[in-house]
From Swiss-Prot:
One of its GO terms (molecular function) is ATP hydrolysis activity. This is Thiamine import ATP-binding protein ThiQ. The gene is thiQ. One of its GO terms (cellular component) is plasma membrane. Part of the ABC transporter complex ThiBPQ involved in thiamine import. Responsible for energy coupling to the transport system. The lineage of its organism: Bacteria, Pseudomonadati, Pseudomonadota, Gammaproteobacteria, Enterobacterales. Keywords: ATP-binding, Cell inner membrane, Cell membrane, Membrane, Nucleotide-binding, Translocase, Transport. It is a peripheral membrane protein. InterPro entries: AAA+_ATPase (IPR003593), ABC_SmlMolc_Importer (IPR050093), ABC_transporter-like_ATP-bd (IPR003439), ABC_transporter-like_CS (IPR017871), P-loop_NTPase (IPR027417), Thiamine_ABC_ThiQ (IPR005968). CDD domains: ABC_ThiQ_thiamine_transporter (cd03298).
Length: 232
């Protein structure tokens, strides 16, 4: 479904190089130390960085040089990137039409996603009137309403308290299962990864150092467990 073959990004003339295959509907955690290249990997998949070499295909189609706006990918950041002067409904609607000219079917889709996110009673509010958790629900709704086959999460819930973070992770996982979306999530928390991802990828020094079952990583028996400070 998603295949990266020696995708290379030159960081201060030092190559970060990734090869990875993810199947449709998989939920994969991207783990590793700070500065290892986790966000770089996601930005290469999203098209925000242009690789120096290598290839990236989605469903067999080459998207190595496809601009972000045309890639079949949605990405959610820690900074929710909501427009402060637009209502919740308008912010979500941008995922369907940049000019906010929505037809009846699109309006219904927008409200259905809002109900799923539990924010249908907030549609007329501005982002500044919402809590941090509510703002991230709006940002997630904007991603999901686009119905792209791949969802990328770059630690969007790290600023939330543990209970709210777990609630959001469950919401993401359930939504991806319902829409049959492929999920890749960058996280510093192996516990968060274990909640929704049966498979994990460990990035270290600009390379994929290990990939396999998350439970093996947590047990301390994986070769990459030590990279994350996990001992058996």
């Amino acid at each position: 479904m998603l295949k990266l073959t020696d995708i290379t990004w030159l960081y201060q003339h030092l190559p970060m190089r990734f090869s990875l295959t993810v199947e449709r509907g998989e939920q994969v955690a991207i783990l590793g130390p700070s500065g290892a290249g986790k966000s770089t990997l996601l930005n290469l998949i999203a098209g925000f960085l242009t690789p120096a070499s290598g290839s990236l295909t989605i469903d067999g189609v080459d998207h190595t040089t496809t601009p972000p706006s045309r890639r079949p990918v949605s990405m959610l950041f820690q900074e929710n990137n909501l427009f402060s002067h637009l209502t919740v409904a308008q912010n979500i609607g941008l995922g369907l039409n940049p000019g906010l000219k929505l037809n009846a079917a699109q309006q219904e889709k927008m409200h259905a996603i809002a109900r799923q996110m539990g924010i249908d009673n907030l549609m007329a509010r501005l982002p500044g009137e919402l809590s941090g958790g509510q703002r991230q629900r709006v940002a997630l709704a904007r991603c999901l309403v686009r119905e792209q086959p791949i969802l990328l999460l770059d630690e969007p819930f790290s600023a939330l308290d543990p209970a709210l973070r777990q609630e959001m992770l469950t919401l993401v996982s359930t939504s991806c299962q319902q829409q049959k979306m492929t999920l890749l999530m960058v996280s510093h928390s192996v516990e968060d990864a274990a909640r929704i991802a049966t498979r994990s990828v460990v990035v270290a020094d600009g390379r994929i150092a290990w990939q396999g079952k998350t439970e093996e990583l947590l047990s301390g028996k994986a070769s990459a467990s030590a990279i994350l400070g996990i001992t058996g």
